[in-house]
Amino acid sequence: MSLTIEKITLACTNISKMPEFYSKVFKADLKEHNFGDFKMYSAKLGNLRFLFCPNEIAGVDANQSRHQFDYIVENVNEVIEAGLASGGSIHSELQENDSELFVTLLDPDGNTINFIEKK
């Protein structure tokens, strides 16, 4: 059996804050979509399609950490600056070992995201 992830949908509490964060941190070109009275946003991050939709549409009752992904980046300090400048915060401080630098940020909804810079 072959399995490929085509799209990830993130249910968001603070949907209005998500575009700025993901545009700056991931350099994603988010597109706005209207679904009745709701706004949703979609983008391609790497080879994966993402859809950000309000909790009300998704019917999700979780308050934070509905997902966690690890991303390999070229410059982790650049990602930290972009995240802090666009509504994110640091969950765990920048750490370093022999092979990588890594940090965990929180997006505006409080979801943890790990960023890793390989040495």
Annotated model-derived regions:
Residues 47-51, 109-112:
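Short, charged/polar, Gly/Pro-enriched secondary-structure boundary elements
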Residues 2, 9-50:
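Core segments of cupin and vicinal oxygen chelate
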Residues 35, 60, 95-98:
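A short beta-turn/loop motif at secondary-structure boundaries
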Residues 1-13, 42-44, 59-119:
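Vicinal oxygen chelate
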